[in-house]
């Protein structure tokens, strides 16, 4: 680093982190226009306290009122004790805009320098009482600056010294201004510039700050410095009390946490600052420690995880406890040093500019930090695409002859012309149907198996969620997914478009969304709200609101074992009214545990005015009670129903977490006969401990974990029903115990320690005309192709982009005057795999017609492009199974020249097939198969596959994804025996001597988990099961018989020695991989079914030549460490389970779970090493041997 030796204090070349707030400062000529634009604001009125809150945003956020502004209409209105209307506020703000002018003069209007809004608003507020600020207003040249100048505002600081307006802090002179530069106008606080009670910030000119004495011995000094500096100027905040300084440091730590979340998630959004930590000069060790928390990320993560709220003593206790393990004590010295992680250092380039002099760079693996509690901000609902054209066509037109991309004017699409939504797409779902829908996971073992149960649960608790898993899991936040549905439902209810009847789920939603008192007609129909109340009764929802309402409905249905029914708002039986969990009396009291400011409390009071509803929690506010479960011994919480949303994620010790969760379950069960409690770590051990503790205390209870609509799409949490009765009387499982292979336990394990590689979603924009051979485009999912091209070349460029992307959006922003077409494409592996089968390029068939000015769309606004897609769980299920089948083919390392895909209607298999491999598809419905044959060498057979007399091809792979159970034309769905006959027929043909090398992979429905789904209240959209007849019906297809895995294995026994065969379960990690690969989010109604994809179907394989007999059964069951080439190498004996560090690594091991209770032996595969050495970097303490076991 360069050292500046000519300064009073040695300065080193520190990190320069740009503060983009400078870019918000306008040119002097723009000041009038930006101040006159409509003001963005937020307004709230507290009916209980009769107080207003009004905050301004944008250029007006820095406005500080003075006594001269008291006469303005806005401040007169804010003194009234009633809620203001939007029209009143907007009119008053317009009047304020006309009255307030910032200091500017005509001499500056031609300047290209920037105008400092921060100092301008201070000058405006201070000019009445300060000679210095009066002079600044008289000469507004003081307020402009050159962004490239290292000595900004020299004139203003010179005036400050002349008028004795500077203040001395630690031997350096600076300019003191209020820290509160964006006040709440509802507080009616004036003259903040000179109010000594307001926290002040001292700004230093670049020539003055080197005199600052970092080594002050004054025990009363408490000065903090921000790590990134607006205008490249250092500023500090002096404090008078230790309490206020500590609160400030914790606030900055919370802000640093938010920044860390954004960087860790690779979230692309406009950020004003990228580091929020502060340096501190003080001799107080406690404050030094709190400052270190904000910028030393390991300490920050562990503190945030362990402390609820901003309790100073708790922050200090946690921080001190972690010092010895985190090796950061040397960085705490109270001399103003700031720690910056190496990742931030490399992301934001260093510079020779004189900046923060005391920066320490340290190494910290961000992805290695546990991030289970991180939350990302969602962008809200998507915008209309009206006016754009969305292309899905495969290029099947004429050849593109002699087109050269190099000669075409192609540029990057300006961000001013498009909005990219990298967060959650909005799902316009039927909330009335979805709310309260749940699917249970039944216990399956007649006895409790404690062999390795505790150890496995501890390891899962300690595993750190990998960055790859975390990134995709953060994409399914329920509040964003339902934003469009909530908005539309609110409008429909307010406009009287829906009839709402008491007792329906729509009634429950109505009570959640609006705060007015419910009024009814004689038939139970809810009367529309008063006209004067509309717009004032909207309830603000949080991310848990719909989940808690869903939990309430779920608890009723579990307890009463009766569907409340809401198809078209019609009731099934009594619905939700009256509220009963026993037939002899109505519910009189409901308790909500873990409430903070829980909207469900008010919702239930509106639904049931006579009901007593108590919300309590350790962070409760408002009408809820600040109370803990442990501290409730003197509070009567006996109730009819109890719902707990208490988190366990802040516990860092497994034993403590487990003990507290069990104690809570016991307490809740003593207060209520019907409980639904959240469990964040649903291991079989913990659920069995709850069950065991209840039995030991003499409680006869059903213990049943469920997942519900309303939870985040990819959460691993469950809600555990603990009830005296219910579940439709189906209590044959009541005495069963949970195993780690039950559905929701498997989901939990696969999320904490995925057994296959899940890709990292990396959002990026590619601004070039990509071709089908640009393989780097698919290195990680998340890329977007965005460019602007001349209209004359748009046909060719859109056609070429369509070879790689699907869909592709196009639009023009004007007719005639605009000669360019904007193009945005989503890269598609399937599309690129298809078009790579030839070196030729083809037009879209649509371009065979004449192209006119509107052919590419006309759009005058800014379109919003969703980088993610909300899709049905059925789509995810089918794609995950397809990926699983081709993974099996790769794992078997078979050689083949042709793939025969049976039932490949949409060429969904194409992305897994190399361009050099011949592809034949059997599907009776595909249109124009000849075009695919001539353009891309894909042979389509428009007919059913002949299952009973198959003609097989040597050196081939046959793939049957969800077709073995499908009927052929004119026939009914095959029974389980008939499905096995189909497989047997293919296997018999394979066994003939004419076939020397061939592999057959497919899937069947599994009968073992149908009871779980059959007990769901409203089966997810597109699914019907009959656990008595063991049938599954998806979509509009007829019911299909399920087949036990053991039946398949029994039927194949006769081919042992000639063919190799086995079954393989679909894991939840493969479901996550499918969602990440395709940028998919499950729709709200079907998201609970994602976990049950694991048990609804299983894969099988049959291959020839046979794998040696001694290894056949175990081949697909043992751990298979990834050899780094994308293939999987079988091992001779079970491999260690991945350690936490290995689980977090993107090169995660591939581990296969057993699917049945089989007598298996170790494999020996020709040409493969017999054993893979253990990674020496893995922790031996956390390794365990994977053992075959029973799934169901």
From Swiss-Prot:
Enzyme class: transferase
Listed Polar residues bias regions: 1159-1183
Biased composition (Low complexity): 1140-1150
Predominant location: virion
Key word Nucleotidyltransferase present: yes
Cell compartments where the protein resides: Virion
The keyword Phosphoprotein is annotated on this UniProt entry: no
Domain of life: Viruses
Entry keywords, A to Z: ATP-binding, Capsid protein, GTP-binding, Inner capsid protein, Methyltransferase, mRNA capping, mRNA processing, Multifunctional enzyme, Nucleotide-binding, Nucleotidyltransferase, S-adenosyl-L-methionine, Transferase, Virion
InterPro entries from the UniProt entry: Reov_VP3_GTase, Reov_VP3_MTase1, Reov_VP3_MTase2
Molecular function as annotated in GO: ATP binding; GTP binding; mRNA 5'-cap (guanine-N7-)-methyltransferase activity; mRNA guanylyltransferase activity
The EC number(s) this enzyme carries: 2.7.7.50, 2.1.1.56
A cellular component annotation (GO) from this entry: viral inner capsid
Chain positions covered by the region annotation Disordered: 1112-1192
Function recorded in the entry: Outer capsid protein involved in mRNA capping. Catalyzes the last 3 enzymatic activities for formation of the 5' cap structure on the viral plus-strand transcripts, namely the RNA guanylyltransferase, RNA-7N- and RNA-2'O-methyltransferase activities.
The protein's name: Outer capsid protein VP2
Protein source organism: Rice ragged stunt virus (isolate Thailand) (RRSV)
């Amino acid at each position: 680093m360069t050292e500046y030796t000519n300064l009073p204090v040695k300065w080193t070349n520190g990190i320069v982190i740009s503060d983009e707030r400078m870019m918000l400062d306008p040119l002097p000529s723009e000041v009038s226009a930006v101040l006159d634009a409509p003001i963005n604001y937020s307004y709230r009125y507290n009916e209980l306290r009769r107080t207003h809150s009004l905050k301004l945003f944008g250029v007006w956020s820095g406005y500080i009122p003075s006594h001269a502004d008291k006469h303005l209409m806005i401040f007169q209105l804010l003194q009234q004790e009633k809620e203001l209307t939007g029209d009143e506020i907007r009119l008053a703000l317009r009047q304020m805009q006309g009255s307030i002018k910032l200091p500017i003069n005509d001499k500056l209007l031609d300047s290209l320098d920037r105008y400092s809004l921060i100092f301008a608003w201070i000058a405006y507020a201070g000019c009445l009482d300060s000679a210095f600020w009066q002079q600044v207003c008289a000469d507004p040249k003081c307020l402009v600056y050159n962004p490239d100048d290292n000595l900004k505002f020299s004139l203003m600081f010179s005036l400050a010294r002349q008028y004795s307006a500077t203040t001395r802090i630690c031997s350096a002179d600076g300019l003191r201004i209020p820290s509160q530069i964006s006040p709440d106008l509802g507080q009616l606080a004036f003259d903040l510039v000179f109010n000594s009670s307001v926290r002040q910030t001292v700004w230093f000119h670049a020539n003055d700050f080197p005199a600052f004495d970092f080594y002050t011995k004054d025990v009363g000094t408490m000065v903090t410095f921000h790590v990134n500096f607006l205008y490249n100027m250092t500023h500090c905040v002096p404090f008078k009390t230790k309490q206020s300084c500590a609160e400030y440091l914790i606030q900055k730590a919370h802000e640093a946490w938010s920044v860390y979340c954004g960087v860790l998630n690779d979230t692309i959004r406009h950020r004003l600052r990228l580091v929020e930590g502060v340096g501190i000069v003080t001799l107080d060790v406690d404050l030094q420690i709190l400052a270190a928390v904000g910028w030393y990320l390991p300490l920050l993560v562990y503190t945030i995880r362990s402390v609820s709220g901003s309790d100073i003593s708790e922050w200090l206790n946690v921080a001190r406890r972690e010092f010895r393990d985190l090796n950061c004590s040397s960085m705490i010295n109270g001399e103003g040093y700031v720690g910056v992680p190496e990742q931030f250092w490399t992301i934001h380039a260093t510079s020779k500019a004189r900046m923060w002099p005391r920066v320490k760079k340290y190494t910290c693996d961000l992805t290695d930090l546990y991030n289970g509690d991180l939350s990302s901000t969602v962008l809200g609902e998507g915008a209309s695409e009206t006016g754009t054209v969305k292309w899905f066509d495969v290029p099947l037109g004429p050849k593109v002859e002699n087109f050269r991309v190099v000669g075409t004017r192609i540029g990057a699409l300006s961000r001013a012309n498009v909005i990219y939504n990298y967060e959650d797409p909005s799902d316009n779902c039927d909330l009335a149907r979805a709310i309260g829908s749940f699917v249970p996971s039944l216990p399956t073992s007649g006895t409790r198996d404690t062999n390795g149960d505790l150890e496995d649960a501890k390891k899962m608790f300690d595993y750190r969620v990998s960055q790859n898993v975390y990134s995709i899991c953060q994409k399914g936040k329920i509040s964003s997914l339902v934003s469009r549905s909530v908005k539309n439902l609110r409008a429909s209810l307010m406009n009287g478009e829906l009839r709402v009847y008491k007792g329906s789920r729509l009634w429950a939603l109505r009570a959640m969304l609006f705060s007015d008192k419910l009024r009814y007609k004689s038939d139970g129909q809810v009367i529309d709200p008063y006209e004067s109340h509309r717009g004032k009764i909207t309830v603000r929802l949080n991310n848990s609101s719909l989940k808690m309402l869903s939990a309430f409905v779920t608890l009723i249905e579990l307890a009463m074992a009766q569907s409340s029914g809401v198809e078209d708002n019609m009731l099934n039986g009594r619905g939700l009214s009256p509220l009963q969990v026993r037939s002899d009396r109505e519910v009189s009291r409901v308790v909500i545990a873990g409430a903070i400011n829980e909207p469900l409390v008010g919702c239930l009071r509106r639904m049931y005015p006579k009901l007593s509803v108590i919300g309590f929690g350790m962070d409760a506010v408002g009408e809820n009670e600040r109370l803990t479960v442990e501290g409730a011994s003197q509070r009567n919480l006996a109730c009819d129903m109890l719902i707990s949303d208490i988190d366990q994620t802040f516990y860092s010790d497994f034993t403590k977490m487990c003990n507290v969760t069990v104690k809570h379950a016991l307490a809740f069960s003593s207060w209520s006969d019907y409980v639904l409690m959240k469990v964040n770590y649903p291991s079989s051990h913990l659920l069995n401990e709850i069950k065991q503790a209840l039995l030991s205390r003499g409680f006869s209870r059903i213990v049943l974990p469920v997942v519900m609509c309303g939870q985040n799409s990819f959460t691993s949490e469950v809600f555990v029903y603990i009830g005296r009765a219910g579940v439709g009387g189906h209590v044959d499982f009541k005495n069963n115990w949970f195993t780690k292979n039950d559905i929701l336990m498997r989901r939990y394990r696969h999320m904490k320690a995925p057994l296959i590689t899940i890709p990292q979603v990396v959002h990026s924009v590619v601004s070039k005309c990509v071709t089908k051979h640009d393989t780097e485009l698919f290195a990680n999912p998340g890329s977007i192709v965005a460019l602007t091209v001349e209209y004359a070349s748009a046909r060719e460029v859109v056609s070429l982009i369509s070879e790689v992307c699907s869909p592709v959006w196009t639009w023009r922003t004007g007719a005639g005057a605009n000669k360019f077409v904007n193009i945005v494409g989503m890269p598609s592996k399937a599309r690129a795999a298809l078009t790579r089968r030839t070196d030729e390029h083809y037009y879209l068939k649509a371009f065979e017609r004449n192209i006119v000015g509107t052919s590419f769309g006309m759009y005058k606004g800014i379109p919003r492009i969703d980088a993610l897609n909300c899709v049905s769980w059925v789509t995810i299920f089918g794609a995950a199974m397809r990926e699983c089948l081709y993974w099996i083919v790769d794992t078997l390392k078979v050689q083949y020249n042709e793939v025969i895909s049976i039932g490949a209607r949409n060429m969904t298999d194409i992305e897994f097939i190399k361009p050099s491999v011949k592809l034949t598809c059997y599907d009776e419905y595909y249109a124009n198969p000849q075009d695919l044959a001539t353009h891309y060498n894909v042979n389509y057979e428009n007919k059913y596959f002949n299952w009973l007399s198959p003609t097989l091809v040597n050196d081939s792979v046959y793939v049957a994804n969800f077709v073995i159970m499908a009927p052929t034309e004119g026939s009914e769905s095959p029974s389980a025996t008939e499905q096995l006959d189909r497989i047997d027929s293919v296997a018999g043909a394979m066994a003939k001597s004419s076939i020397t090398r061939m592999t057959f992979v497919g899937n069947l429905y599994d009968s073992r988990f149908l009871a779980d789904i059959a007990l769901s209240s409203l089966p997810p959209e597109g699914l019907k099961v009959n656990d008595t007849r063991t049938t599954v019906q998806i979509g509009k297809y007829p019911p299909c018989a399920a087949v036990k895995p053991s039946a398949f294995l029994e039927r194949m026994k006769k081919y042992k020695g000639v063919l190799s065969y086995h079954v393989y379960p679909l894991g939840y990690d493969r479901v996550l991989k499918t969602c990440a690969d395709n940028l998919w989010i499950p729709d709200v109604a079907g998201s609970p079914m994602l976990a049950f994809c694991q048990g609804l179907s299983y894969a099988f394989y049959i291959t020839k030549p046979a794998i040696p007999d001694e290894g056949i059964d175990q081949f697909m069951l043992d751990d298979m460490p990834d050899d780094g080439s994308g293939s999987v190498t079988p091992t001779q004996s079970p491999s260690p389970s991945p350690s936490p560090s290995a689980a977090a690594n993107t090169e995660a091991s591939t581990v296969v779970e057993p699917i049945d209770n089989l007598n298996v032996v170790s494999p020996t595969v020709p040409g493969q090493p017999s054993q893979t050495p253990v990674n020496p970097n893995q922790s031996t303490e956390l390794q365990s041997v994977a053992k075959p076991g029973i799934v169901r």
